[in-house]
Amino acid sequence: MKTLRHALIASSILAASAVTGAVAASAAPVLGLTGDKTLVMFDTAKPEVTKTMDVTGVTKLVGIDFRPGNKTVIGVTADHAIVSINLETGAATEVAKMDKMLTMTEAPVVVDFNPMADRLRFMTGTTNHRVHPDTGAVTVDGTLAFEEGDMHKGETPNIVSAAYTNSIGKPEKTAMYNIDATIGALIQQTKPNDGTLKAIGKLGLKDKPATYAFDIQGEEGGKNTAYLAAGKMLYTVNLETGAATEVGTISGVETDVRDIAVLPAM
């Protein structure tokens, strides 16, 4: 039986051979989180699930991401443990436990790495935490709020997913983008530690999905491609306008995709 890692490699090769060179160069494998702790694998160019795996050693994952600093897949559990996930076996190994708790409700929880600082951004509602992934030390950053001059100034943001650009190695610069479910728009977190937000533009989705999962694929040369899994549909998102363009239905999943992590192209 193929392991998840082997399936990721095979899927990426197949997708690359099925499309033109320009698209093939940026085709990459994606991990999706469904249910409480199930990982699914598909490709950015062909969103058909080719492998599923339950993560062992945890009860529930609230989010996942790829950590560029050490090239591992990281998950965060509902009890604030940071775990490393072995893609060969599905086993989760605790790396650290956060020393400050994030009040969790039914609202989505944001889990994403700042590749430049090698710190984990951990947010829900308007609460904005920055976490050392090896020690669990939490810095409580500024409350999320739209900045002065933004058309949504004074409104309560509803940030449900986030991602950083240039997530490859340790870049010299990065930028953070979010999805606001109330507005249905792409938002830039202009000063991530301060929590300041600026609306970029509407996604333009026909129907409001139950879940939003967002990540940005960084490549050598500074190219960044944003992907949004809205329910069971995969889109690319223009980081300059916010407009979403349909890639295709994520086939082979039983429930909506709650989070995604784009892995380096193999």
Predicted regions and their residues:
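Loop/turn residues immediately N-terminal
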Residues: 36-40, 71, 79-83, 126-128, ...
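Structural signature of eukaryotic scaffold interfaces centered on beta-propeller domains
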Residues: 63-71, 102-118, 154-172, 209-222, ...
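An edge-strand/N-cap motif at the start of beta-rich repeat modules
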Residues: 26-45
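Blade-level signature of beta-propeller repeat domains, shared across WD40, Kelch, NHL, RCC1
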Residues: 243-266
